[in-house]
Structure formats: C-alpha cells, structure tokens
From Swiss-Prot:
GO molecular function term, any single one: uroporphyrinogen decarboxylase activity
EC nos: 4.1.1.37
Protein name according to UniProt: Uroporphyrinogen decarboxylase
Catalyzed reaction equations: uroporphyrinogen III + 4 H(+) = coproporphyrinogen III + 4 CO2
UniProt keyword terms in alphabetical order: Cytoplasm, Decarboxylase, Lyase, Porphyrin biosynthesis
Amino acids binding substrate: 26-30, 76, 153, 208, 323
One Pfam family of this chain: URO-D
UniProt site (Transition state stabilizer): 76
A Gene Ontology biological process term: protoporphyrinogen IX biosynthetic process
Species the sequence originates in: Prochlorococcus marinus (strain NATL1A)
Gene Ontology cellular component annotations, sorted alphabetically: cytoplasm
Length: 352
C-alpha cells in the first residue's frame, strides 16, 4: 500500500486500490448540527463560503466527524461570478439571485476575465490549509460549475424549473449564448488551474442543469464547453484527475464519457452496471447511491453500497451518492454510509 498518496487520488488515477474511496457531495452542510450552529452565528452564505476561516472550518467538519477519503472545498459554483463583474446573493430557502441577469451582447462584452488569484484569493488560502491539515489521510477536492450551468443561472437570474429564458436565448440568439459560454469556459478553466496550484488534487465540474437539455442541444451548448475546460486544464495539469457530474444524466451519459474527463459521476437513476457499459473502459465512475436511501435503515444503506461496489468491480470507482446529501438526513446514517464504504470488502464477503 502506498502510504504517501491519498487513496482517492490513487483510485482517480486508475491505480490498483484496496477498496473504492468514499466521500459525499455536499458532505459539509445542513444535515450536520455543527454546520447549523455555525450558520446561526453567520447567516450569510456568502460570508460562510468567502471568509477563509469559516470556509476552512466548514470544509473540515465532515472530515473531523467521519474521516471520508476526500475533503472538498466548501464554496459555491457561483463564487467566481463577482470576479467577472456579476453580482449575486444566496437567499436561504430560495437559492441564488443574480442582481442583473445577463441578457444582452453588451453585458457579455462587459464581462471581465476571471483572475482568481486577485478576486478569490480566499479559495487558494482554504485549499492550502486543507492540504496541510489532512495530509495523506484524504485527497483535497476542488470544484467549479460548468459553463452551461453558470449561464443558466446568470441568464435566468435565479433557479428555474423550465429554463425558458436561457432556452429562448439558445434558440433565438445562439451566437450571444455561445459568446457567454466561451467566456465562462475560459474563466472556469483558469479558476480550476488556480485551485490545483493552490492544493486541489482532484477537481469536479458540476453541470447540474445540463440534464435539462436534449442530446442534440447538449452537443451544441454543453459538451463543447465542458471539453474546452478539460482541454485548457489538462494542458497545464495533465495528471490532475477531473470528474464531471450532471444531474439527470441518463440521456447524455455516452456523451459525458467523450468530454475528456477521467471520471463520470453517475446519478442514482442509472444502474451502475448499465452505466459502466455505456462508458469507455478508460473512463472511471463515481457514485451512485440514492441520497434518499440515507433516510432508510442502516442495513438498507449497507446493502445498496455492496450492490454498487460489486457492480463497479474492475473499473476505477469512487463511492459517492448520486447527488448531494439531502438536508434533514440523520447524521448517524451519514456515518453508516462512510463506515460501510470503508468496510465494504468485509460486507461483500458476508453478503456472498
């Protein structure tokens, strides 16, 4: 066993590992009492995610509690926007609000190139502190929102159920949208490189809303910009594993595997065995336990983890949920998830 490289990083690189590493999307958050207590004292989400002391403390909360194999930066996919000249706020229970939605060519042309070391130095500070704190016990993960999802937020101005405004732009003014997406792709690639230089060992790109696109529109408005981000980052950091996650990805799974990422994160609506058949052998998988299962019994959680891990055997696999952990999830069930992931080899023997 290689003691000097974290398990998750070895797995993401495709090295032989003793078990799949385990972490959870949104593992730092509202389901944890320590987070809710901190939130009561610091009610502004932007303060919690942009104050380096708070972001560091929150990022470390699940590591202190559960010792996952990955520690992800506590931040938000919209955090880079002010550095490009787009102001936003996150309102509890309502989500993000963009003060001045991007709807015109002038607004796109007025956007600033992102210089993360100037506008987001707090991110670099937190990542460096996380690396120092967890050492080789866990891999430090960075993340970004993909261009389509960022565009969906800034064009709509808020979360949306049907994405009518950005789809109207896509089908009426496609060149305008392409300019916006290209700006985001270049800025996000720059931001990811900054995260890697600051200490992130694995990075994940969330294209949360790309699952709202038809396959042909995914090919035009999402995939090329995912690929551009991957290519720009890999030019500078060829050895840093990259993960792509899309919520509701069943219709575009094969396309995700062609973007150049190292790992595709599956949501829980795709059976792990089926998902593997639909992806190239060289592409690893992450996932894909239904987060709703964590409201169930410990035995149900263990049984599903065994099922997922057995189906992924022989491929590079990172055990995770198929979406972020849900608010209200019992903390003890999160503990069961992590412990079952770490003891999965024994659980598989018992189940055979």
């Amino acid at each position: 066993m290689n003691e000097t490289t974290p398990l998750l990083l070895r797995a993401a690189r495709g090295e032989h590992v003793e078990r799949p590493p385990v972490w959870m999307m949104r593992q730092a958050g509202r389901y944890m009492k320590v987070y809710r207590d901190l939130r009561d004292n610091h009610p502004s989400f932007r303060e919690r995610s942009e104050n380096p002391d708070l972001s560091y403390e929150i990022s470390m909360q699940p590591f202190t509690a559960f010792q996952p194999d990955g520690v992800i930066l506590f931040s938000d996919i919209l955090t880079p926007l002010p550095g490009m000249g787009i102001n936003f706020d996150i309102v509890e229970s309502k989500g993000p609000l963009i003060n001045d939605p991007i709807r015109s060519l002038k607004q796109v042309k007025d956007l600033k190139p992102l210089q993360p070391e100037e506008s987001m130095s707090f991110v670099g500070e937190v990542l460096g502190r996380l690396r120092e704190s967890v050492g080789n016990k866990a891999a430090v993960l960075g993340f970004v929102g993909a261009p389509w999802t960022l565009a969906a937020y800034v064009v709509e101005g808020k979360s949306s159920k049907n994405y009518a405004v950005i789809k109207a732009m896509a089908f009426q003014e496609p060149e305008l949208l392409h300019q916006l997406l290209n700006h985001f792709a270049e800025s996000i690639a720059n931001y990811l490189s900054y995260q890697i230089q600051s200490g992130a060992q694995v990075v994940q790109m969330f294209d949360s809303w790309a699952g709202q696109l038809s396959p042909q529109d995914y090919d035009e408005f999402a995939a090329p910009y995912q690929q551009k981000v991957v290519n720009l980052v890999k030019e500078k950091h060829p050895d840093t594993p990259m993960i792509l996650y899309i919520s509701g990805s069943a219709g575009v799974l094969e396309r995700m595997g062609q973007t150049g990422v190292d790992i595709v994160s599956l949501d829980w609506t795709v059976d792990m065995a089926d998902g593997l058949k639909r992806l190239p052998q060289s592409v690893g998988v992450q996932g894909n336990v239904d987060p709703g299962l964590l409201f169930g019994t410990p035995d149900a959680i263990r049984s599903r983890i065994v099922d997922v891990v057995k189906k992924a055997k022989g491929r590079k696999h990172i055990l995770n949920l198929g979406h972020g952990i849900l608010p209200g999830t019992p903390e003890e069930n999160a503990r069961v998830f992590f412990e079952a992931g770490k003891n999965v080899n024994e659980l598989i023997k018992v189940s055979s």
